[in-house]
């Protein structure tokens, strides 16, 4: 009996030890999985970031200099933030509609392309501290404003854009016909409005203002009476990658404090400081 009891005690002790080891390993793996994104990036010394390369002035190729270098406000913000974290940046160019999928699948570590921070997206992704604040405007034909007076007049109008942007959500909400482009240039978007292939482009105020200035001969303008949806843009990362989010926020905080964000903004946005919140009378849109 004594031997039997002793055997049971040994088996019980072994079983408990086995489960304790399993629990410890499980806990370690859980902790590791939470940090694995940042640790892998740090070990490689490189962060992979999705961007379009076609969205002036936030992500574009500088053909004027003859170098065709990828640059722009967000491109340089990411480069500087990464530099402060001891990292190099590899940019992967793709259409905006594929960026969030690429982040979730792990194809890239982050995406930077004037991506709006929304409540719905915050439930699915991690965002950095915003580095750009703006609001929505509408590019229309100059001679007749494309027959649009208010957002309600979008019904039946042909709205140009990418399918997954918040601006296409606005167009959808007001009954516009969607004309979807895949990583098109500003020139293509603007010429299509001017020649009547489309009627309106809903997008960010700063981006539209600069895009318009680049093509002064086209029959297009920013609608004088339509200002809507105050918004903010940030770097988007996988929801589980809290460590990377924290590191990026630390770098961006430093850049805001020492004036680097303001300097980059003024360089790319015609001396405007997009890193500061806007004080303007802007219509809210509930999406």
UniProtKB/Swiss-Prot annotation:
It holds the Pfam family SBP_bac_3. A lipid is attached at residue 25 (S-diacylglycerol cysteine). SUPFAM superfamilies: Periplasmic binding protein-like II (SSF53850). A lipid is attached at residue 25 (N-palmitoyl cysteine). Keywords: Cell membrane, Lipoprotein, Membrane, Palmitate, Signal, Transport. PROSITE patterns: PROKAR_LIPOPROTEIN, SBP_BACTERIAL_3. It is found in: Cell membrane. It is a lipid-anchor. Disulfide bonds: none annotated. Its main location: membrane. It comes from the Bacteria. One of its GO terms (cellular component) is plasma membrane. Residues 1-24 form the signal peptide. Belongs to the bacterial solute-binding protein 3 family. Probably part of a binding-protein-dependent transport system. This is Probable ABC transporter extracellular-binding protein YckB. It comes from Bacillus subtilis (strain 168).
């Amino acid at each position: 009996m004594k031997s039997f009891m002793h055997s049971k005690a040994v088996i019980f002790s072994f079983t408990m030890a086995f489960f304790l080891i399993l629990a410890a390993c499980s806990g370690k793996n859980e902790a590791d999985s939470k940090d694995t994104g940042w640790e892998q990036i740090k070990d490689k010394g490189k962060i992979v970031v999705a961007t379009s390369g076609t969205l002036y002035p936030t992500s574009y190729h500088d053909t004027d200099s003859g170098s065709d270098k990828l640059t722009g406000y967000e491109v340089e913000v990411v480069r500087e933030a990464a530099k402060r974290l001891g990292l190099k940046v590899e940019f992967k160019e793709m259409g905006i509609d594929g960026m969030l999928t690429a982040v979730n699948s792990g194809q890239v570590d982050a995406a930077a392309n004037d991506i709006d921070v929304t409540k719905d997206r915050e439930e699915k992704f991690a965002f950095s501290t915003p580095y750009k604040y703006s609001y929505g405007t509408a590019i229309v034909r100059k001679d007749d404003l494309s027959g649009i007076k208010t957002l309600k007049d979008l019904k039946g109008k042909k709205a140009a854009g990418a399918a997954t942007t918040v601006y296409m959500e606005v167009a959808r909400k007001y009954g516009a016909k969607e004309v979807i482009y895949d990583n098109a240039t500003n020139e293509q978007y603007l010429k299509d409005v001017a020649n009547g292939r489309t009627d309106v482009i809903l997008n960010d105020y700063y981006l539209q203002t600069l895009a318009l200035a680049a093509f002064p001969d086209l029959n297009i303008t920013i609608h004088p009476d339509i200002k809507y949806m105050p918004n903010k843009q940030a770097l988007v990362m996988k929801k589980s990658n809290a460590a990377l989010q924290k590191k990026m926020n630390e770098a961006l905080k430093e850049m805001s404090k020492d004036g680097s964000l303001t300097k980059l903004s003024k360089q790319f946005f015609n001396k405007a400081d997009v890193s500061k919140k806007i004080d303007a009378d802007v219509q809210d849109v509930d999406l």
